[in-house]
């Protein structure tokens, strides 16, 4: 005979690397006149799964109120937006702010948009680069991105650069 075993992927993904869980079940065989019972035991081993990047989005607008659209996955402390899991939200603050991704197993691109509040152009300035998580700082046009050695990152807007934007104009550091 044969059998097929389909692991509960959610339970298997929750295992730490090197961890294990055992599942077993009984089966009965028969030759038409006699039967016997056997047990199949399956051990699922945890591995270090490759990270899956989830985009985090933070928007800082000058002269407004601090809000977060997806508060179920975020914690606000002062002028910081700490993200865990997949996030898409707005951080709107009247002073300098930072955005921290605390998931050390994932890496993703970071896009920050600065906006002045009223009237004017809606043009966007964008650039794109890739950076390693080695504890370095990268200075963009409108702020500084610091990538921690543990994979965390913080973006701090530069007030002088964002003050140069016209009212209603936005710019993106990517």
State each model region's role.
Residues 1-174:
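Acidic/polar, solvent-exposed loop/turn segments
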């Amino acid at each position: 005979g044969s059998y097929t075993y389909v692991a509960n992927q959610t339970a298997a993904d929750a295992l730490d690397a090197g961890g294990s869980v055992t599942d077993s079940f009984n089966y009965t065989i028969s030759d038409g006149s006699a039967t016997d019972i056997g047990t199949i035991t399956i051990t699922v081993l945890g591995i270090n799964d490759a990270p899956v990047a989830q985009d985090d989005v933070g928007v800082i607008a000058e002269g407004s109120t601090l809000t977060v659209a997806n508060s179920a996955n975020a914690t606000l402390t002062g002028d910081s937006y700490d993200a865990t899991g997949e996030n898409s939200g707005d951080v709107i603050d009247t002073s300098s702010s930072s955005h921290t991704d605390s998931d050390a197993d994932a890496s993703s691109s970071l896009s920050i948009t600065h906006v002045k509040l009223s009237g004017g152009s809606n043009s966007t300035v964008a650039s794109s680069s890739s950076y390693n998580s080695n504890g370095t700082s990268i200075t963009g046009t409108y702020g500084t991105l610091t990538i921690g050695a543990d994979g965390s990152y913080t973006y701090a807007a530069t007030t002088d650069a964002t003050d140069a934007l016209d009212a209603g104009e936005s710019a993106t550091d990517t």
